[in-house]
A protein has these predicted regions:
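Conserved PLP-enzyme active-site core in the AAT-like
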Residues: 1-152
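Non-catalytic terminal extensions of PLP-dependent enzymes
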Residues: 128-361
Length: 361
């Protein structure tokens, strides 16, 4: 089960174990995009490693990509095994069996710096240090979201607009860093466009700083008259020395770590406010995106930044790209299985395969 997503949705692990635990010997949680949930107290129910489990519960495996938002070199990852509560039962997987299964797929010439990075990461988080690092980081990112909500009108963070009868940005930062109400997907809420989930099932990962740009009426699922494609904002930020993690049709993502300082985040906010001012002033594209303008001057000669946004937005709108993208992930639009993936893998290993162009697949 994928515990957390790239874009910042995270499961309630306790709820998963309560719902399906009795059906499983073990549950494997893929926590590649998280791994720090046990160091943020309000996220304790999202951490499979912090659950109190008994002999009737499943064993737990958790894998984490330490290199993403923790202190690890590229490719550094780790696997955790939590199953002392079922030791002695037939389903229990001993430590040596796990190690031998792992070694069957591991290199005998590993890069030892990766192991050193794991040790450094563990030491950094030892005792109360890990909690202090991450809770302070959460507060920093909360303040950044508040600044955007108060100062921007085209760009907003993906958070509930109102919590407990008060605007999100009017909440007390100390409380918000310790209360999952400010990060919850409540059933029936319309601000995010998701459907088909239960109370307490999903939360926003506070360390995935995602901004939504104008252009899509999320509550009604339709396009607005004007919009700012995420790619335009991403290129503007790169022009100004800020590298986003990724962008999509109408959003942009930053992965936050304890290394983020108030100074760095204030710089991001200032750049976003400046971008909106350039949109309102309909500044020349050559001023806002000089590198792209220079590379394609024949195409964009005389363009303004608002004109570019409108042209790209209309392209998406006329083709209903937002709906097409959403359909990619719906069951009714998935391709029909001709053969199951395991059987296909065996046939591939036997050489019974052919490389074809994507349009023929």
């Amino acid at each position: 089960i994928q515990l957390g997503t790239y874009d910042g949705c995270i499961y309630n692990a306790r709820q998963i174990v309560e719902k399906i635990g009795h059906l499983c010997d073990y549950i494997y949680f893929d926590s590649a995009w998280v791994g720090y949930e046990q160091f943020i107290p309000m996220m304790k129910d999202c951490s499979p490693l912090l659950l109190e489990l008994g002999p009737e519960d499943p064993g737990i495996f958790v894998t984490q990509s330490v290199h993403k938002q923790q202190a690890g070199f590229s490719m550094t990852s780790q696997a955790h095994k939590k199953d002392s509560h079922i030791k002695g039962q037939d389903r229990y997987v001993p430590h040596k069996r796990v190690n031998n299964a792992f070694m069957m797929h591991a290199s005998t010439s590993p890069l030892y710096q990766l192991f050193a990075a794991l040790d450094v990461n563990a030491k950094m988080h030892e005792g109360e240090a890990g909690k202090k690092l991450w809770v302070e980081a959460v507060k920093t990112v909360i303040e950044t979201r508040k600044q955007i909500l108060r100062n921007c009108h085209y760009i907003r963070p993906l958070v509930p607009p109102v919590v407990n009868g008060k605007k999100w940005e009017d909440g007390d930062t100390e409380k918000m860093a310790n209360d999952m109400d400010y990060w919850a997907f409540e059933p029936g809420a319309k601000w995010h466009g998701f459907e088909g989930y239960g109370k307490g099932q999903y939360f926003i990962d506070p360390m995935k700083l995602q901004f939504v740009t104008c252009g899509i009426d999320i509550e009604n699922g339709g396009y607005e008259e004007f919009g700012i494609p995420g790619n335009i904002l991403a290129n503007y930020l790169r022009e100004n020395g800020i590298i986003p993690e990724k962008c999509d049709l109408n959003d942009i993502l930053f992965l936050m770590t304890p290394a983020e300082s108030k100074t760095k985040m204030d710089d991001l906010v200032a750049k976003l406010i400046r971008f909106e001012k350039l949109i309102d002033e309909d500044a020349p594209m050559a001023e806002v995106l000089p590198s792209i303008y220079k590379a394609y001057e024949d195409k964009y000669k005389g363009y303004t930044i608002r004109q570019l946004c409108q042209e790209m937005h209309d392209f998406y709108k006329d083709r209903k790209v937002f709906t097409l993208q959403k359909n990619l992930f719906l069951h009714d639009y998935l391709p029909e299985y001709v053969i199951n993936p395991q059987e296909a893998q065996y046939e591939f290993m036997r050489g019974h395969g052919e490389l074809v162009d994507l349009e023929q697949a």
